[in-house]
């Protein structure tokens, strides 16, 4: 089945683009917007409406495969590609990318995705095409291969990487945003496997001595017991955005720090706990050093809390560096930051055989189409967990990702059933 054409149309993403540096520099939030001037290149305001570029690949039989070019909320920060503007990159996809893909065999996802990954970067100003372009077009290529072959995208990825896909839904990870109590209770009622994120992104929220986070975990444990279905064994996952580093500071293997993590474990009990982004060391190598120091300190003290890499773990090479250094129990695979969707699968698989698990993450600023593609990455690689996305409302993203996995598993089960002899 040949690719006939590639078309695009500008669309919307599930959240907003935020100028992270301006916010860190003290921009004042007024209602939902921020006062002040942006400081990151490409921004006209500190908070702007999210954009996506909808990609359609037309196959020889007239069928259409779709993907969405999307970028993270904090675009342009931390060495990421520039702020993604759909209209700016539309000619890139409909021009050089489309020219390269027309006539290609749609069933050959691996070859097509590799060609896209290696395309000339002249319009993006970096070493490759903009990550959002590679992300969206590769989703369409994945769907095109699945349609041409009459299988699920999970099967395409499993065949490409010779994996045994998960046979049940990968645990979905819900994020609460600032509505950390109301949304957590929603998650508990629905039996979400991993929750609640919590958005602990300031000392005010965490507490000057960390008491705010500890009290929240104790509340969450009580509510999980009261509201969760039977049986229910969730895993607690909170993101502290480096704030514990501000509260305690290095070295992170000292008794004061490990004792505090033990109080977090006790507050969360009987549910297991993982803490994302405990500190922000300002650079990848420094972050790896401090994360490893904390992880070793917790192990030596017998504190059973998992540490999750987030800050300075954006690209495939970053994931490799954290895993090789044994600096985390779990790494987030930030799908839009890796470019082609196949790179996310490769990043998860890099963790196989190591002491580090991987979760298929991403951003609230994605789309339904990209979230569904990531659900197949999680299934094909049997990831530790997968983010509920897009948006910050929780319910919608949880529905999208959960239903996509259930559909894929049901279809795979049906096609693998052997009919009985007459």
Curated annotation (Swiss-Prot):
InterPro entries the record matches: Enolase-like_C_sf, Enolase-like_N, Me_Asp_am_lyase, MeAsp_NH4-lyase_C, MeAsp_NH4-lyase_N
Catalytic activity: (2S,3S)-3-methyl-L-aspartate = mesaconate + NH4(+)
Known function: Involved in the methylaspartate cycle. Catalyzes the formation of the alpha,beta-unsaturated bond by the reversible anti elimination of ammonia from L-threo-beta-methylaspartate (L-threo-(2S,3S)-3-methylaspartate) to give mesaconate.
Pathway per the UniProt entry: Amino-acid degradation; L-glutamate degradation via mesaconate pathway; acetate and pyruvate from L-glutamate: step 2/4
SUPFAM superfamilies per UniProt: Enolase C-terminal domain-like (SSF51604), Enolase N-terminal domain-like (SSF54826)
Keywords annotated in UniProt: Lyase, Magnesium, Metal-binding
Name listed for the protein in its UniProt record: Methylaspartate ammonia-lyase
Coiled-coil residue windows: none
Organism classification: Archaea, Methanobacteriati, Methanobacteriota, Stenosarchaea group, Halobacteria
GO molecular-function term, one example from the UniProt record: methylaspartate ammonia-lyase activity
Quaternary structure (record): Homodimer.
Superkingdom, taxonomy of origin: Archaea
Residues of the active site: 334 (proton acceptor)
Organism of provenance: Haloarcula marismortui (strain ATCC 43049 / DSM 3752 / JCM 8966 / VKM B-1809)
Cofactor(s) of this protein: Mg(2+)
Binding-site list for (2S,3S)-3-methyl-L-aspartate: 175, 332, 363-364
Binding site for Mg(2+): 239, 276, 310
């Amino acid at each position: 089945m040949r690719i006939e054409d590639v078309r695009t149309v500008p669309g919307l993403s599930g959240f907003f683009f935020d100028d992270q540096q301006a916010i860190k520099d003290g921009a004042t939030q007024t209602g939902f917007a921020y006062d002040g001037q942006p400081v990151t290149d490409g921004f006209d305001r500190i908070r702007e409406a999210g954009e996506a570029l909808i990609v359609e690949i037309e196959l020889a039989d007239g069928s259409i495969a779709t993907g969405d070019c999307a970028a993270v909320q904090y675009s342009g920060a931390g060495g990421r590609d520039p702020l993604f503007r759909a209209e700016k990159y539309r000619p890139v996809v409909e021009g050089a990318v489309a020219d390269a893909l027309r006539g290609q065999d749609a069933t050959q996802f691996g070859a097509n995705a590799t060609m896209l990954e290696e395309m000339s970067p002249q319009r993006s100003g970096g070493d490759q095409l903009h990550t959002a372009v590679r992300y969206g077009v590769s989703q369409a290529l994945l769907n095109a291969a699945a349609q041409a072959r009459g299988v699920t995208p999970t099967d395409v990825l499993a065949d490409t990487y010779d994996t045994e896909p998960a046979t049940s839904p990968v645990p979905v990870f819900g994020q609460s945003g600032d509505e950390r109590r109301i949304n957590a209770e929603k998650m508990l009622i629905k039996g979400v496997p991993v929750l609640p994120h919590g958005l602990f992104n300031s000392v005010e929220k965490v507490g000057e001595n960390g008491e705010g986070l500890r009290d929240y975990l104790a509340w969450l444990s009580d509510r999980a017991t009261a509201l969760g279905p039977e049986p229910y064994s969730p895993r607690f996952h909170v993101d502290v955005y480096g704030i514990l580093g501000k509260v305690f500071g290095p070295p992170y293997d000292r008794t004061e720090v490990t004792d505090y993590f033990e109080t977090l474990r006790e507050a969360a009990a009987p549910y297991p706990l993982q803490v994302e982004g405990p500190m922000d060391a300002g650079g990848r190598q420094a972050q790896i050093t401090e994360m490893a120091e904390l992880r070793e300190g917790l192990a030596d003290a017998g504190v059973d809390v998992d540490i999750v890499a987030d800050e300075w773990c954006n690209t495939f090479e970053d994931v490799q560096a954290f895993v090789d250094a044994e600096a985390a129990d779990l790494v987030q695979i930030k799908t839009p930051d890796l470019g082609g969707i196949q790179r996310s699968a490769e990043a998860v698989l890099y963790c196989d055989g190591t002491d580090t698990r991987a979760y298929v993450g991403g951003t609230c600023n994605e789309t339904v189409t990209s979230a569904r593609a990531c659900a197949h990455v999680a299934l094909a690689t049997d990831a530790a967990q997968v983010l509920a996305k897009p948006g910050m409302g929780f319910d919608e993203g949880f529905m999208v990702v959960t239903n996509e996995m259930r559909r894929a598993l049901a279809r795979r089960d049906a096609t693998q059933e052997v009919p009985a002899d007459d």
